[in-house]
Amino acid sequence: MARRMIVTLLAAFGLLASPAWAVERGALFKVSGHGHTMVLFGTIHMGLPEFFPLDESITKALAASTTLALEIDPTVQTAETAAAVQRVALTTPAIVAAMPPALGPRLTRRLEALGAPAALSSQLKPWMLLITLTTVEYAKLGYRPDLGVDAHLAKLAHGRHIKVIGLETVESQLGLFDRLPVADQWTLLDETLASLDSGEGQQEMRSVTRGWARADRAALDALALKYEKDPRLSSQILQRRFLAERNGPMADKLDGLLAREHHTMAAVGLMHLIGKDSLPALLRAKGLKVERVY
C-alpha cells in the first residue's frame, strides 16, 4: 500500500520515546573491498530530538572518513531546487480529470482538516499531494526534516570539512514519482488517504521507527519480508521502482567510491538496507565483503 511509500520515501517515521543517550539505532554494515573500507548506515529522513546523539560507532566512522555519501545532501537545497520542484509538481487539466470521482470529497476533507486549501487538489499532481499530506501528518507528530539523520550527518560532515556527495539528485527522485502512470498516482494517493484515515499508516510508521530506534534486526527483516510479499500495486511499485531500481545504481556508485577512497561512509534510507534486493545484497553480489554490525 501507499503507506509503505510513506515509510520508504518520507523516511520511515513513527512515534517514539527514547532515552537521550547514545544507543545503537538503524542498521549498520561494514563493507570491504579494493583494499578499502566503507561504513554503511541506514537512516530516517525526518526525526525527533530523542534520536540523538547517535551511537559512537557512527560518529567515529564519520570522523575517520574522507567522504560521506548520502542519497542527496539535505543541507544544500537551493532556490533553484525549489523552483524545479514547483515546475514538476504542478498538475494539468488532464490529470485532474482522471481523478476517481469518489476520491475528490475524501481528499477535500483531508486537506481542510489540515488547514490546507482544497484547491490544492486541482493544482498539484497526485504524487505531490501524497507527499504534502504525509509530510504534514508527520509534522503533526513532531517529526522534523532538520532532525533527519541524513541532515544531522551532513551538518557534522560539513563542520569537519568532510566531503559530502549525493548518490542521487532531487530531480531524479522526483522523476520516480512523476514517471508513474497517472492512474497509479491516483491509486497511491487513494491508498494513502485510506491508511491515514484508518490509522494503519501511523501504526506502520511506529513499527518501522521502533525497529530503527532499537536496531531491531528481526523486526526490520520481518517488515521487509511483509512488504515483499504484499501483492498490491503500490507495494509492487515500492519494491520495483523506489527500492530495486534505485539500489542498483546506488550500489554501482558505492562500489566506485570504495575503489577510489580508503575510508568512507554512506548513509541512506533504512529501507534500502533490508530485504532481498537491498544494497548489502547487491554489494555482496559484486564480490565485496559485507558484514552486519547491528
Model-derived regions, located:
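Alpha-helical transmembrane segments and their juxtamembrane interfaces
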Residues: 13-14, 53, 279
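Structured, acidic catalytic/metal-binding patches in enzyme active sites
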Residues: 23-238, 242
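Positively charged n-region of N-terminal signal peptides that target proteins for export
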Residues: 1-5
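Residues in and immediately flanking transmembrane alpha helices
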Residues: 16-17, 56, 282
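A cross-kingdom marker for long, charged
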Residues: 236-294
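Sec/Tat signal peptide C-region and signal peptidase I cleavage site
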Residues: 18-22
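Bacterial N-terminal signal peptides
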Residues: 7-17
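Short hydrophobic "helix-edge" motifs at membrane interfaces and signal-peptide entry regions
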Residues: 8, 32-34, 259-260
